[in-house]
Amino acid sequence: MENLVFVSAQPDVQYFHWQVKVYVHNFIEKGINPNNIHVIFAIVNKEKKPTEESLKLKEMGINVHHYVDDRFQKHYIPNIKPFLISKWLKEFPKYGKCFFLHDADIIFRQLPNFENLLNDDI
């Protein structure tokens, strides 16, 4: 599990900041290395730079990435996630082999056996 990267992608808005704080605290509490946690934010609402609150998340020891939301069509909100993942993978292709993509509203009661999932042929 040491090579598994945990990734969430969402707009850089207050609603998601607190969700990220909660799940990061939970992940670290369950033994996930903060260095393996990547939070990807879209800079939205015609802003040009990340919010202070999203930048402060770096103090938790996690990786925080920001990309301007320059999608041509923004009316279908869920497509922000694949948009952000593609931007992130273009910048960091080494993470493309294996990552656990999750929403920001996640917590683990206990960790799944990721080794079994990683060794599955499916």
Where are these predicted regions, by residue range?
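GT-A fold catalytic core of metal-dependent nucleotide-sugar glycosyltransferases
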Residues: 79-122
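N-terminal anchoring/stem segment of glycosyltransferases
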Residues: 1-77, 88-95
